[in-house]
Amino acid sequence: MTEAAELPPAPEQAREVFGDRFADAVRYAELLAEAGVQRGLIGPREVPRLWERHLLNCAVLSEVVPEGVTVCDVGSGAGLPGIPLALVREDLKITLLEPLLRRTNFLTEVVELLGLDHVTVIRGRAEEVMGKIPPVHVVTARAVAPLDRLATWGIPLLRPYGEMLALKGDTAEEELKSAATALSKLGAVETSVLHVGEGVVDPLSTVVRVEVGESPGGVRFAAKRAKAARTGRTRRRR
């Protein structure tokens, strides 16, 4: 049996980033280190670096999220980046989208315990909920899938002229080049690689931004979205 790793104290940067929600950030870190490890949501080797590699790495995504928008965190897992983002940005309306029950149970417990009234947890896959939940301004994701595959799930959930923000690693530029054709077919009009978290995390967090035009997901997904919307209206009339 592997001995449980100990959660280190929060770094000073965490107090600055999370502000009034610092105590909640500490509680979330404790939940990840305890229940998260016990339920297999996060590896025990990640516990010593929870703050730098996970909570702060995700929280600094807020630097590139517009004010007062709706956000869907696709494949939210244990709540990364959705929960840290929610802790630092109460102006956002955030949906945590996750297909696995054990993960959505954990997310629901965290949301209720921390009093995150601006966060909703939905169990499901992105391709299943398209047309069933309102399109959002921003889709976020971290460690879900290669960019081309992630885009086929995330971009169709966007409103016209929305954007997908994917936390990536050193291969961000390569992934973006490899996914160029797929992104274009999905309605992307602008892409970029951003580095955020100056003075908070080292190395900086890398974000791939994909901005879409009038038809997120392209023609094929526009038709699918319209069909899902019509089906929803029919069911409501019944």
UniProtKB/Swiss-Prot annotation:
GO cellular component, as recorded: cytosol
Transmembrane segments: none
Keyword S-adenosyl-L-methionine recorded: yes
Function recorded in the entry: Specifically methylates the N7 position of guanine in position 518 of 16S rRNA.
EC number of this enzyme: 2.1.1.-
UniProt organism field: Streptomyces avermitilis (strain ATCC 31267 / DSM 46492 / JCM 5070 / NBRC 14893 / NCIMB 12804 / NRRL 8165 / MA-4680)
Gene Ontology molecular function: rRNA (guanine-N7-)-methyltransferase activity
Name of the protein this chain belongs to: Ribosomal RNA small subunit methyltransferase G
Entry binding sites for S-adenosyl-L-methionine: 75, 80, 126-127, 142
Family to which this protein belongs: Belongs to the methyltransferase superfamily. RNA methyltransferase RsmG family.
Location of this chain's protein in the cell: Cytoplasm
The UniProt record lists the keyword S-adenosyl-L-methionine: yes
Gene: rsmG
Predominant place of localization: cytoplasm
Enzyme class (EC, first level): transferase
Keyword terms, alphabetized: Cytoplasm, Methyltransferase, rRNA processing, S-adenosyl-L-methionine, Transferase
